[in-house]
């Protein structure tokens, strides 16, 4: 009987399952190499942890790893129901809150090694967490894509740790009770981007869609479609970073000015940025809450031992 020790949390409604023990040891020299090793040699562990019957499509996994940098607190590899994520803002907040819950860290600045580089997270005395994300930027502006059944849609392509297609003019109602229609619309948009060859820099696939609307209690409300056809319950840390990059490029948000990004569930992140050469360094602040401390069991005789 194999065992996996996990800590579950949610950040703005979006769950994170932090794997503390039980996965195979990884030997790569960088977090990117370790992610690739996990994907190529041990992917069944991701499936067992996140897919039914132990998980669900909404869960985002975070594998706690020893740091690869001398000044880092830890390393992390993020994954979901469909595969692996480059970076995850809400997951980083969940990671830091979980480590505090277990008594492994105290308030202060903690550096974290990820597959796309080192980020830092500040655990504040009041429990809020600010992630200094990877340098972010807008790659292309107002790119047209023909979405079958919906016509031509224009959006910006931006990097915030993942590749996003950001759309403000879409004609959709961004409300929680409209989530099924929004899911189908944004999934069709993702597929249209793929079939029409619209990509991020160097042909990188765009795997997130972000729609925006007005919100009475924030600067903006979003709906974020993630790979695997699950929408983000939080405002999305990497998506908010991509939004900040677009706002900075358009001259609509000054350096250091706060942007309040609401999600479709009403949760909020507070974002700001600092200039970093031709890119920006986003700072995303949010909170996470613990929901479970569990041991997952894998019985080799179970026909669904490694997920459905």
From Swiss-Prot:
UniProt-recorded Gene Ontology molecular function terms: 4-hydroxyproline epimerase activity
Keyword Isomerase: yes
Keyword field contains Isomerase: yes
Active site, UniProt feature: 88 (proton acceptor), 236 (proton donor)
Catalytic reaction list: trans-4-hydroxy-L-proline = cis-4-hydroxy-D-proline
Binding-site list for substrate: 89-90, 208, 232, 237-238
InterPro entries: Pro_racemase_fam
Domain of life, source organism: Bacteria
Enzyme class, UniProt record, top EC level: isomerase
Enzyme Commission number: 5.1.1.8
UniProtKB keywords: Isomerase
Entries under PANTHER family matching the protein: TRANS-3-HYDROXY-L-PROLINE DEHYDRATASE
Family designation: Belongs to the proline racemase family.
Name of the protein described by the UniProt record: 4-hydroxyproline 2-epimerase
The organism of origin for this protein: Pseudomonas putida (strain ATCC 47054 / DSM 6125 / CFBP 8728 / NCIMB 11950 / KT2440)
């Amino acid at each position: 009987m194999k065992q996996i020790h996990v800590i579950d949390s949610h950040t703005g409604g979006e769950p994170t399952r932090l794997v503390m023990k039980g996965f195979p040891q990884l030997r790569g020299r960088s977090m990117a190499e370790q992610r690739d090793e996990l994907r190529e040699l041990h992917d069944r562990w991701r499936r067992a942890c996140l897919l039914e019957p132990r998980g669900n499509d909404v869960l985002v996994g975070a594998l706690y790893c020893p740091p690869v940098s001398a000044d880092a607190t830890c390393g992390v590899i993020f994954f979901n129901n469909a595969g692996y994520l480059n970076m995850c803002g809400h997951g980083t907040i969940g990671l830091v809150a979980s480590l505090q819950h277990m008594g492994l860290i105290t308030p202060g600045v903690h550096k974290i090694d990820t597959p796309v580089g080192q980020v830092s997270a500040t655990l504040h005395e009041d429990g809020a967490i600010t992630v200094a994300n990877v340098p972010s930027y807008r790659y292309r502006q107002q790119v047209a894509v023909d979405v079958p059944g919906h016509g031509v849609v224009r959006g910006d392509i931006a990097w915030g740790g993942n590749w996003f297609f950001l759309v403000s003019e879409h004609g959709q109602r961004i409300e929680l009770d409209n989530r099924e229609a929004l899911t189908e619309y944004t999934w069709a948009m993702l597929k249209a981007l793929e079939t029409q060859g619209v990509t991020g820099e160097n042909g990188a696939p765009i795997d997130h869609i972000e729609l925006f609307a007005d919100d009475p209690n924030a600067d903006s409300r979003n709906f974020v479609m993630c790979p695997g056809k699950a929408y983000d319950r939080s405002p999305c840390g990497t998506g908010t970073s991509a939004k900040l990059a677009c706002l900075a490029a358009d001259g609509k948000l000054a350096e250091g000015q706060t942007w309040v990004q609401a999600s479709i569930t009403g949760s909020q992140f507070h974002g700001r940025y600092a200039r970093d050469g031709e890119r920006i360094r986003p700072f995303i602040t949010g909170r996470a809450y613990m929901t479970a401390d569990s041991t997952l069991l894998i019985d080799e005789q179970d026909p669904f031992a490694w997920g459905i």
